[in-house]
Amino acid sequence: MRPPNMAFLSELRYPTRWYSKLIVALVAISFFTFVAAAIISGFVVYNIVTPRSGSQPIDLANFPGHPEEISYSLQASGTRDGWFFPGLKSAPTILLCPGYEEGREELLPLATALQEQGYNVTLVDFSGSKSSTGIGTDLGYREVQEIRAALSTLAQRTDVDQGRFGLWGTDLGSYAALSLAESDPRVRAVAVESVYDTPQQMLRILLNGYGIGSLPLLPSFAERGFDWLTYQDAAIPPLSQRLPRLAGVPKLFIEAADAPDLAKITARLFFQSPEPKQEEMLARGKYAGMLDDEKRSYENRIASFFLSSLPK
């Protein structure tokens, strides 16, 4: 006679009774559910960190404002390039940081508007390269280092104010801008639209855009996959924990009604931020998608903020 445990294992291997068949079916369904969830979440995360849109080239030689291309280096990640629009000699420089899946060429009118006020303006590009891991973005961690490198390169020029810079950004760009402002005293004013506290928050918002944010297993699997990709940055604290460092630095927080999740986070960061600070609420965000009248109003608001906070 077989021992009871051997009989049980044999029944699971070759089920003949209804309950053993049910157990085997449940185990198989659970296994394939986990495998499917892992595959789907991995595919979604891959699509998020490898955005499809990129910066388009322009003919700098014939573009108004006489822009020039600049290059700056990142440790172990090669070089990047930016577009520098010269303003008044020894004037501050404003760096414009594009958002997620946004090309820098979409910000050219904003750059021109700020250049007309006498500022030096630089457009950075987050979309033109991939890291050694093959990803195009980690939703902010690496982008902070990119604009830090751009700012340090600009600070070596003799035709700009080497100690005063302004930053502007939206979503991805705003996270990078505010994060750099919290750690670099050369940043004297910062304007952020639809900013988030951690890259994981942006990941959840993007997962909702893919329609899997409320499904079982998929969000947690996706978050674990993203955390694995960005494990080297796990110790970086949220922006909210570093806001006290910005005491005395003028800040403009812009909330867009058409991005309600990001608007709530932006409002919370505004509330937690030390003075001086300003708050602006818009019906429509994302400068590139605005109508012409909305763009002009937006340009005037950004220019007004920097004129009062970062005098030439």
Regions found by a protein language model. Give the residues of each.
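An N-terminal hydrophobic leader/cap segment in hydrolases
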Residues: 4-5, 9, 18-73, 80-83
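Short beta-strand element of the alpha/beta-hydrolase
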Residues: 91-99
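Conserved alpha/beta-hydrolase
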Residues: 111-133
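Alpha/beta-hydrolase active-site loop
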Residues: 137-158
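Glycine-rich nucleophile elbow surrounding the catalytic serine of serine-hydrolase chemistry
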Residues: 169-179
